[in-house]
Amino acid sequence: MVAEIDNSAEEADDGDWMTHMLRSSIFHRIPASNIQAVFIKMEAHPVRAGDVVIKQGDEGDYYYYIKQGRAVVTRLTKTGQTIKLAELEAGSSFGEEALISDTKRNANVTMLTNGVLMRLAKADFAALLQGPVLETVTYDEAQKLVGSGAATWLDVRLESEHKNAALPGSINIPLFMLRLKTASLDHSKKYIVYCDTGRRSSSAVFLLTERGFDAYLLKDGLMAIKQAVHP
């Protein structure tokens, strides 16, 4: 009898996190077959308070969804200071930046409490989520959208890079600050996201889409503009 009650509670708990995850705007863009595969491929990963789930500088291996627990996102600066970027709770996801941009982890994620994470391996993430979610536009298409007032440029490079060369009228929010700064963006606007090559901006588009923003990736980044001007 006890086993039956425990199993029912576990099934209800599984249903709750899956239902919550399906509310993400990400799942509005992917086929039903992909959604089913995501839930099949995801594996449970128990964690304890103090566990470092992601370490800055490491290679990206998994995309994470917090089923239970809370975590903190921090970044170590070049001067040795630790900056707190965000606190994550059940229903939050993290780890997509390094997977999409194929770069090293740009922050630490440490558990504040015991919990359970659901994780998806890099190859499965790329095949099931990343591909269908990222919508790209060419430089010509982006120019028309921005010129008509239908969209705004969003530069996710570092502030120093933005000051050195940026598209007129663009907003600058470095990728590593984007989680913290999304509240400053307008859900009623479209955003054309760019960086130098498209790597960082790909991560930004995924993160923004996940949060319900209408975001598009400038294909090939600023390199596309250089090619358009100097073919």
Q: Whereabouts are the PLM-identified features?
A:
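Cytosolic regulatory regions built on CNB/CRP/Popeye-like sensor folds
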Residues: 1-164, 177-179, 200-219, 223, ...
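Short loop/helix-cap segments at secondary-structure boundaries that form the rim of catalytic
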Residues: 162-168, 185, 228
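Helix-loop module immediately N-terminal to the HCX5R catalytic loop
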Residues: 169-192
